[in-house]
Amino acid sequence: MKILGIETSHDDASVALFSENKVEILLTISQFELHEQFGGTVPELASREHSRNLAIILEKLLGKNIDFSTIDAIAYTKNPGLIGPLKIGFLFASALSLFFNKPLIPIDHLLGHFWSAAIENDLEFPVLSLLISGGHTQLIFAENKNNLEIIGSTVDDALGEIYDKIGRSLGCGYPGGPKIDLIWQQNNVRNMELIDFSLPKVLENPLDFSFSGLKTQVINYTNNLKENYLFSQKKVVEIAVSFQKTVIKYLKRQLDLALKTKKNVKTITLVGGVAANSEIRKLIKTYENKYKVVIPKKEFCTDNGAMIAKAAQIFLKFNEEK
């Protein structure tokens, strides 16, 4: 089964050709350098760039002499995401579908992230997945490949969102996640005196997340230093490292709670754009002594067409088995 997957939910235009369990082609054009000057993604600008970038990707695809007659379906991200970029992706997918007479399959972006763990790996069910991205933070429990349940979700900000906001407050630039993680990697964290930011409280659903309080703590602390002329590069490092340390503790707490709730878990996966974070990846690997741990390559953590194609493949096989 061969699927062409198209992802345009945010600022990455990505197209992949996925055959059975192999990514034959993955072409992605990112816009983060364009949006960096604005401190975040500008939807109208993103839509315009997607139109240009998808044309470039199509030209590259055609240059690879792909036999479109062998493709079984064309999949695209339907939602969630920015309306303009999603529409551009839909129009692009629809045009290919009509021209090559192939079925069109709409795919949920978050479902794509979940299945990104299966692009190069076999998942042993039941699976507990931590999905962390710029717009979402979720714990997903899958009893089997056809039965997925969101057991925990953020009630306010997503993790990637607060990384960006705190990165902006510290003057690190956009996107904040990779910038803060780089600070972590470049400093001797073990011997550093850390700031004691408090962990978020347990919510009505203990598996839900709340990051707004932590965000407020960190930004208020930073602003107080600025107002008293005590803000320095040394403080930027201390705040960034202390923030990430608190995030790691919080994610571990939530994962441990989920594993106590779902006692039959065999596999833990880490997916989504923030899954590229080096220390969060290390955290998930600490569970390897009891569970199978699957973390996709970084190219499959960020938004990509391969995860959309993989989700479509699962969908088609499920329908065939009915």
UniProtKB/Swiss-Prot annotation:
Protein name from the UniProt record: tRNA N6-adenosine threonylcarbamoyltransferase
Coarse class of the protein's main subcellular location: cytoplasm
Summary of the function given for this chain in its UniProt record: Required for the formation of a threonylcarbamoyl group on adenosine at position 37 (t(6)A37) in tRNAs that read codons beginning with adenine. Is involved in the transfer of the threonylcarbamoyl moiety of threonylcarbamoyl-AMP (TC-AMP) to the N6 group of A37, together with TsaE and TsaB. TsaD likely plays a direct catalytic role in this reaction.
GO cellular component: cytoplasm
GO molecular function: iron ion binding; N(6)-L-threonylcarbamoyladenine synthase activity
Recorded family membership: Belongs to the KAE1 / TsaD family.
Keywords attached to this entry: Acyltransferase, Cytoplasm, Iron, Metal-binding, Transferase, tRNA processing
Classification lineage: Bacteria, Bacillati, Mycoplasmatota, Mycoplasmoidales, Metamycoplasmataceae
Record's cofactor remark: Binds 1 Fe(2+) ion per subunit.
